[in-house]
Amino acid sequence: MKLIKKLIILVLLTNVISACDAFLAPDKDNIFSESELIKDPSMAEGVLLNAYSNLPNSVNFTEVATDDAVSNDNSNNYRLASTGGWMATNNPFNTWAGSYTNITYINLFLTIVDKVEWSNRSDWQNEHYKERLTAEAYGLRAFYQFRLLQAHAGYDESGNLLGYPIAAGLITVNDDWRSYPRASFDDCVNQILSDLDIAIAGLPDVYADAPNDNTIKADYDKVYGSRFLNRINRRAAQMIKARVLLLAASPAFNPANDLSKWEAAANAAAEVINVNGGLNSLVNNRLEYYLNENNADIIWRKDYTNSRNLETDHFPPSLYGTGRMNPTQNLVDAFPASNGFPISDALSGYNVNAPYTSRDPRLDKYIVYNGGKVKNTTINTIDGAKDGINMVAGSSTRTGYYMKKHMNQNVNLTPGNLISQRHFQTL
């Protein structure tokens, strides 16, 4: 009997210890092997979707670093950069870490895309899924490389025009970055264009459902249908190509003024315009494209969001905003008269006593000036008004002007009656 009791106790202790081991054992982490990724198409696609989730989702007001605008925020990074505070630890133009993180996701995806069964419904779906996702990956990689080129290209101490280290393959933590020196500017441009050519060849013009009489409608919609709206498409890739070529032709990177580069940029831009309907299809009112969900001129944008962040930052203080970005007189004077002549030309008819009348209509749409309106409210920036120069610390204009562009006039910041509105962010 005593032996039986001892055996029972031993079994119970063994079970308790096993239970403790199971309880104390760490759960499986969120890191998956390649073999696990390729078994699950949703998980494999998620690697690429990481690069989508990190696309820019707001407006960067870099004008504060130029003579076109100032900020009333003493800690604004662009203000600091323009006043001697531009450092490696405080670089608002930096896209290095973010771009390479996304390029790494993309390169990882490209190593597995051919190994995944993307659809078991039909061979057509499987092959076209793979083709489209591969093209998306190359298009996104080109986009992030373009951001690197914009932010980090320049001349070294020897006068060589350099770009960024080209990472065309997967780089791991065990790789030595010293084996990836900065490539020449031209090599970077060629790498981006090569990626874009692959993207353009494999992407649809737009994502849209097939007509009902299409014999492969079910298959087509599954791969190229409207549910993929806002993913990179052929037109977006062509648009990026045009911008890359324009950057390469610009005086900053084309000091010899090679006209063939300008020609290439012009031809690429014309191609984008033509595939989007041509010049005659441009929307007549292009002043507020960022407020219109269905503006045909927008080639690629992110999903709209309901928010009031922009208005909170930039409405005048009388409308409960903090008036962060203030256009300068230099920018205001750049808007010509309504007849097209610069206001410095006598033929413009510019009246110094009525400086905002008979001006280019974009002035009223983009900038709040004294006597201008926001939300049908007249804004007074002189005579000691609340919206006047430096009247409210950290909220009032420093120049006599407020920003109006990108603001949704239907947003209400009145305490107790807050109203958010949609904003459409173009890429």
What would you call each of these model-derived segments?
Residues 350-426:
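Flexible, polar/acidic helix-loop-strand segments at domain edges
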Residues 45-46, 53, 77-155, 175-208, ...:
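Conserved, well-structured interaction surfaces
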Residues 206-225:
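Surface-exposed intrinsically disordered loops and tails
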Residues 20-66, 285-288, 335-357:
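Membrane-proximal, proline-rich intrinsically disordered regions
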Residues 183, 239, 250-267, 421-427:
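Acidic, serine/threonine/proline-rich low-complexity intrinsically disordered regions
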Residues 1-30:
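Bacterial Sec-dependent N-terminal signal peptides
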Residues 243, 249, 272-355, 361:
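Polar, glycine-rich mid-to-C-terminal structural blocks
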